[in-house]
Amino acid sequence: MENLAYAIGYYRKKKGYSQEQLAERVGISRQHLASIEARGMNRGLSLELLFNISTVLDVEPYMLLKFKIEP
């Protein structure tokens, strides 16, 4: 899940959105989004929310799930 957390943050920043802006567009609180993006997140992420985030960020869901962190 750590790569997913990084992927969401990466694509959010690439789109120029703050956490507040993305959270508002997706329909969750900024705190919820922050917990999703947190390293080693323990908060669950539904498929519906994953699809909503990927739609707003204009990326395919698999791109979030297959995201690779370069050393």
Which residues make up each language-model segment?
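A short, Lys/Arg-rich alpha-helix, primarily the initiator
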Residues: 1-14
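Short, basic-rich loop-to-helix N-cap that marks the start of a DNA-contacting helix
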Residues: 40-55
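Recognition helix of helix-turn-helix/homeodomain-like DNA-binding domains
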Residues: 28-43
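Alpha-helical residues within the helix-turn-helix
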Residues: 13, 24, 55
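Short C-terminal boundary/hinge segments that cap the last helix of small helical domains
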Residues: 58-71
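Conserved hydrophobic/aromatic packing and binding residues within compact polymer-binding modules
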Residues: 8, 22-23, 33-36, 64
